[in-house]
């Protein structure tokens, strides 16, 4: 896996099995995952077409999954451990309608070990739980914003991480599992650090 920031877009390149809750999301095998900054006034006629066009502009011509955020990439948090690399942008100027004022929290988790289908989807739940906990611990009275999204992926040809020792995929990603605990730690750390940098 390689990643860089180009024109306020985080671009992650590799060979991934992934699932996304973002625009044009779903389950896919992709070569690129990206998180693009857009203006706070962002309101295109077709967000789905916009994200496809922006991918092309960034030189992404093959299969990809992408997210959008109003958060500047200078606030991007990258957290790596033996299990995964987490990429997190956090802002709370767009909170859920049933709570206060709002932003966007985007979470991208790239596992170094193969994930079962159960773990791939379960990691979304664990990351979302951790996001809510981070906000509550920061003193907010809401659990997220109305534009939040999560991408969970694993590298199909990775030979690093726990898989290299056990030669087995990670079966589950619930918050009580070792992998789930790592997700929780990374997400809480990344969200808190990102918000603090923005003075939120």
Swiss-Prot record:
Keyword vocabulary terms for this entry: Hydrolase
Domain of life according to the entry: Archaea
Reactions catalysed according to its record: adenosylcob(III)inamide + H2O = (R)-1-aminopropan-2-ol + adenosylcob(III)yrate
GO molecular function annotation: adenosylcobinamide hydrolase activity
Disulphide linkage map: none
Keyword 4Fe-4S attached: no
EC category: hydrolase
Pathway(s): Cofactor biosynthesis; dicyanocobinamide salvage pathway
Family to which this protein belongs: Belongs to the CbiZ family.
Record-given protein name: Adenosylcobinamide amidohydrolase
Species this protein is from: Methanosarcina mazei (strain ATCC BAA-159 / DSM 3647 / Goe1 / Go1 / JCM 11833 / OCM 88)
